[in-house]
Amino acid sequence: MEFPKEDVCVDMHRVLFEIAYALDAVGYDEIYHGHRVAYIAYSCAMRMGWSEEKAHKAFALGLIHDCGVSENSELDVLLTSFIPKETKRHCIKGYELLKACEPLNQFAIPILYHHTDWRQLSEITNVSDDDKQLSALIFLSDRVDYLQCSRPYDSYGNVTSENKRYIAKELSANAGTMFEPSIVESMNELLTCDDFWFSMEQRHIENLSSQFVHTFANPLQTGLEESICVAELFAQIVDAKSSFTYQHSNHVARLAEYLAGKLGYSPQTCRMLYLAGLIHDIGKLKTPSSILHKPDQLTDDEYCCIKRHATDSRHALENMFKDSLVIDWAANHHERLDGSGYPLGLRAKQLDGPSRLVAVTDVFQALTQSRPYRAGLSLEKTLSILEELVDDGKLDRQVFECISANREICYRISTGREYLAEPA
């Protein structure tokens, strides 16, 4: 089966902002933390006379510096004090995620060390001076944002002069130990500038970045395989929110690609379906962990919250993948042929083959995977439930029959027992 050939591209500028938005959803009381750290780091870099390219890299690092954080419990550690006790886990995780993502691997080393004390970082011999400076700047910028958010604002929502002095005092007290001294000096100068504080708002920060978009990420737009690398990063961030949904996106992606091959789709369409599987649940980053982990039946309000993840997915994907078929294939995974699905209530004539394939694949994988309220189902039970949904006119019969005909390998892919599908 063929679809119009398209060169799938992902906008790396928007990817970095979507990572920041995704991390806001993990549990920060103060949203736009990534935006503010990016802005603080960039502003300080420019004051120090860094090159525009290096300052732009600092901005990008600020947006994604906490990409290794997935649960509220990890955030709680970072937000308990000026000097948090445990930071290595999310730094290492962020490093691993970025190192494996070719379009973003330039950011891996600075993220690995972005909570490392300057005394220790300055002695490391296998890290470039630029990466050391970037790590040190992100560390300092992150702690500036912690300090300004941890103290009360004035009655109009502005940082008080007293708090500016307090922040500068804390930074100076730790210069040469926690923080790189010359960066502390420049940061303290910056803290006295009213415009610096007044411009620290999400809309101003995004407008600022649009002025240097062409050096923000290199290349700005990437092709299908690079898009898949980015999608794999997002899938790991999404799946890590819950041990019960861990690897769900990855397994859906692999199974969708395998079934597409069996159904005669072109190699490019198969890869696009793999991409769609990876990103279909990206909207779940905004779903509270308490709902994802709930072992009991959901209330109406909680179910409504679950349902909105499909819409949140669509909006995020529209920002990153402009006018791509992949957006619909991923975002339609809870639509049903009889119109009973969500969030749009689409019917059969509005759902193309790939959208139907992802929907069936998502249900099959979810049934075979353990969830808070039940253990993973057997292959026989899973097929029985799927067949009932097909008979009721909700799911596509052709995709179901393909799964049924290749049931053993589909079950192994779905449960993670076989990551490499047999040749189509």
Tell me the role of every PLM-derived stretch.
Residues E2-A424:
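Histidine- and acidic-residue-rich, metal-dependent catalytic cores
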